[in-house]
Regions:
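Glycine-rich phosphate/pyrophosphate-binding loop and the adjoining helix
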Residues: 82-130
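Helix-loop-strand module that forms the ligand-binding subsite of alpha/beta enzymes
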Residues: 8-89
Length: 130
């Protein structure tokens, strides 16, 4: 597959580009580290620069968890994600929704939030709109 912008690195990212271009819905999931994405997710975001002009009409969702005690601690990661989508907006892409699992420092903490129910409802909505 030919991209308008070619990534100079020839690695497994080519397959990720292909999957992103074929998808209608793209979900980014990352724990919050120091108010923003972990390094792996930031690397993925940076690497998608190679397809920014060819990725069109996608619906983006953000799923994130963190030990932070309240939603305000997630403002930076949400703003960063919105700015990322803004860079891609030229192609009709949009940031649809986010699920923020705050106070989730332990594996079972997520079950004490409404995050699982919200994720389920979003997945149902996506399925209905396919």
């Amino acid at each position: 597959m030919l991209f308008r912008s070619q990534c100079v690195q020839k690695d497994d990212m080519q397959e990720i580009y292909k999957k992103m271009l074929e998808a209608k819905v793209i979900v980014f999931a990352s724990p919050v580290y120091f108010y923003t994405f972990n390094a792996s997710m930031k690397l993925l975001i940076d690497r998608t620069f190679a397809i920014e002009k060819t990725i069109h009409d996608k619906y983006f969702y953000l799923l994130t968890t963190g030990l932070a005690p309240e939603e305000s601690y997630f403002r930076i990661i949400k703003d960063t994600f919105q700015k990322y989508i803004d860079c891609l907006r030229v192609g009709g892409n949009r940031f649809v929704d986010s699920i923020l699992g705050f106070q989730t420092g332990n594996k079972d903490d997520i079950e004490k939030t409404d995050s699982i129910e919200k994720a389920y409802n979003i997945a149902k909505e996506i399925k209905i709109n396919e």
